Design a protein with these regions (language model features):
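Polysaccharide-binding and catalytic clefts of secreted carbohydrate-active enzymes
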Residues: 1-141
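Aromatic/acidic polysaccharide-binding cleft in carbohydrate-active enzymes
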Residues: 114-127, 152-168
């Protein structure tokens, strides 16, 4: 992370917790492991090298990252619409179901996603899984994206077995 990201995360937290560090400490349960903060300036972005990370901090970080992603998508969308008045605008999401930013960009005309059936795991269906993948992935993705905005699209799809499946 860079300094601007840390400052933006702290600003996000100040706004969320009404510029009240005690409110943040209470919400994060920092007294339990002697992690009490006396200032928002002491807070850093979660680092994977940390031995133990506060789960509440990670959750707030994910919310912050989702907001940053959506702000960026909305900014791009509005810029495109400024110059291309009759153009639909979408983005190519990947169905990572634990990502919080999906559906958070109201300026997009509709959401779309990419789904590749074969990408290196077989999910317990044997050698065939490495060749053709799991067909349920497309069903899960459709069920996930359908309620986001109603209209959705599949931007990219691997339609079948890759002709070099025995190699990769």
């Amino acid at each position: 992370y860079n300094q601007a990201a840390e400052v933006a995360f702290r600003d996000f937290l100040r706004n969320k917790y009404h510029n009240n560090i005690k409110e943040l400490n209470d919400a994060w349960g920092t007294a339990f492991w002697s992690e009490v903060y006396s200032s928002f300036d002491e807070i850093t972005l979660p680092k994977t090298a940390q031995m133990f990370m506060n789960h509440h901090q990670i959750l707030d970080y994910r919310r912050f990252a989702a907001r940053q992603t959506n702000d960026f998508l909305n900014e791009q969308c509005l810029l495109i619409k400024k110059y291309a008045h009759n153009q639909w605008v979408t983005t190519n999401y990947i169905p990572n179901y634990d990502e919080g930013h999906i559906g958070g960009s109201p300026d997009l005309d509709f959401v779309s996603y990419t789904r590749y059936m074969v990408y290196g795991d077989n999910e317990g269906i044997g050698r065939r899984g490495y060749r053709v993948g799991n067909p349920l992935r497309i069903a899960f993705a459709n069920d996930f994206f359908r309620p986001v905005q109603g209209t959705y699209g599949v931007m990219e799809l691997q339609p079948g077995q890759v002709n070099w499946g025995s190699i990769n």
